[in-house]
Amino acid sequence: MIDKNLLKKICSGFEVELDAQALERFELFGELLVEKNKVLNLTAITDPEGIVIKHFADSLTALRMIDPKAGDRVIDVGTGGGFPGIPLLIARPEIELTMLDSTQKKLAFVTESVDALGLRANIVHARAEEAGRGTMRETYDFAVSRAVAAMNVLCEYCLPFVRVGGTFCAMKGSKGTEELGNAEKAISILGGETEKKETLLLPDGGERTLINIKKISHTATKYPRPSAQISKKPLA
C-alpha cells in the first residue's frame, strides 16, 4: 500500500537508514492503521503518501536528535495511535520502548499493532502527570513526544520520566523556536537544559522543529502537578 521506496528515500535524506525488514513492517503498519481507522478515529491522514510523510517519516526525524542503543529505555509520552513510538521501534527494534497514553481504545490498537509486527513494547494506560510521580519516574534514557501541548506544558509532563543525564526530544511544528523561548524557565525549574535544536522540512513542505532537552538535575518532587493546575497555571 505505501511507497516503501519513498519512505526509504525521505529517511535517507535525514540520515536514517531502514533495512528491508523495517520497510516490510512499515507497509504492514500502514495497512493496520488504515483498516482500524475505519472504526476508530486514529488519524485524519489515511492516504498512502500522507501516511509515509506525515506519520512514518515525521516520527523518524527524532532519530536525527537521539540515538538510542540496544537496551536503552525510551518512553513515548502521549503516543495516541503509536506515534512516534511504533516507527521508532520498527527502526530500532532493540530498544526498550514504553508507549503511554490515557486513551484505552487507542492503546488497544497500539498493542494489536506491536503484536502483529512481531515487536515488543511496554504499553501503559495512564495519565502522564500521574505516571510521572510513580515508579516510572526518572527511569528513562530518552523521552519523546509529538503531543500538541505548548513546550512549557509538555516539559512538565515529560521531563519527570527522564533520568539525570538522559534526554527529552520534543517534536514541535513551525512555532517550536517561539515555544522554546517561552519555555526556558520551565525547563530550568524541571531540571533540564536546552541542548540542541534543529528544523527540518518534510517533502510536503511541513516544518518540524526538534528540540533536545538534557536532564541535568532531579525534578523537584512537586512536579508534575495535577493536569488542571498545569493547564491553569503553566510554568513560565
Q: What feature does the model see in each segment?
A:
Residues 165-175:
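Conserved beta-strand signature within the Rossmann-like core of class I S-adenosyl-L-methionine
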Residues 92, 162-164:
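Helix-to-beta-strand junctions that scaffold the AdoMet/dcAdoMet cofactor pocket
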Residues 106-108, 176, 180:
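Short alpha-helix immediately C-terminal to the canonical SAM-binding loop
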Residues 2-75, 105-120, 125, 226-228:
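Class I SAM-dependent transferase core
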Residues 129, 150, 173-177, 201:
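Short "lid" loop at the C-terminus of a central beta-strand within the Rossmann-like core
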